[in-house]
């Protein structure tokens, strides 16, 4: 009998918690004036308005592109095989047509930043992560990109000499840290083509530096790094009024 009661209580608590998360997610969307998104044009407009948007889970319930898009735009696996994920396919057009910045900026996870907010974000992050040391692997990666212009990840990895076993994840770690430092961004996504001339697969990130993609002036900011960070945090509280200081700072740091 006691075990049945414990199971029932546990199940009820789980249901309450799930409803709480759903309520918070809806509140984040409603209080931020964020309507459900059905296409890339709407998502471009939303990023223009709110400035920052992680692609997937941000640690703030309801605040990600995956949370905001309509159900038929999310990841689905078909019973007969194959998959579809409209949101994933929009990333390239959001960068190239919406001119938003994309990379692993939020606690090592991918997301979008509007060009309006990029100077403040870049100002804060580059102060926190100074230029790589001379002779370091990070410097070699940036010099290779400066020389080549833009490269998909596997090409960049090969040119930097990371060709041995277990080198892929190690190299990806360096690239992620450089994205967190706003030294590398994604220019577009490149997809393999099948024999029917159709794109397929997850695609490869075409990496470059923000200076090459947007010009050096795009990074300039007339505030101190501390002022930029305070400005971003204050703005995020208007976008996500139900988020705590700790949640926002964890996402941004």
Describe every region a protein language model picked out:
Residues 22-253:
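Long, low-complexity intrinsically disordered regions
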Residues 1-3, 34:
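Accessible peptide chain termini
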């Amino acid at each position: 009998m006691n075990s049945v009661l414990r199971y029932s209580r546990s199940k009820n608590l789980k249901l309450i918690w799930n409803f709480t998360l759903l309520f918070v997610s809806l509140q984040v969307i409603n209080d931020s004036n964020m309507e459900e998104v059905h296409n890339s044009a709407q998502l471009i407009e939303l990023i223009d308005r709110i400035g920052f948007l992680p692609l997937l889970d941000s640690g703030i319930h309801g605040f990600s592109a995956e949370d905001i898009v309509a159900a038929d735009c999310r990841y689905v696996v078909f019973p007969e095989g194959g998959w579809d994920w409209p949101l994933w396919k929009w990333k390239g057009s959001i960068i190239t047509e919406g001119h938003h910045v994309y990379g692993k900026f939020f606690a090592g996870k991918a997301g979008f930043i509007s060009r309006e907010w990029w100077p403040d974000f870049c100002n804060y992050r580059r102060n926190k992560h100074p230029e790589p040391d001379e002779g370091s692997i990070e410097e070699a990666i940036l010099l290779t990109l400066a020389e080549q212009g833009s490269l998909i990840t596997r090409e960049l990895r090969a040119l930097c000499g990371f060709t041995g076993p277990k080198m892929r994840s190690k190299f990806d770690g360096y690239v992620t840290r450089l994205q967190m430092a706003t030294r590398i961004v994604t220019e577009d996504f490149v997809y393999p083509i099948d024999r029917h001339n159709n794109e397929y697969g997850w695609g490869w990130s075409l990496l470059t530096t923000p200076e090459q993609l947007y010009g050096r002036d795009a990074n300039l900011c007339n505030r101190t790094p501390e002022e930029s960070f305070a400005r971003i945090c204050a703005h995020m509280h208007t976008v996500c009024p139900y988020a705590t200081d700790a949640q926002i700072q964890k996402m941004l740091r």
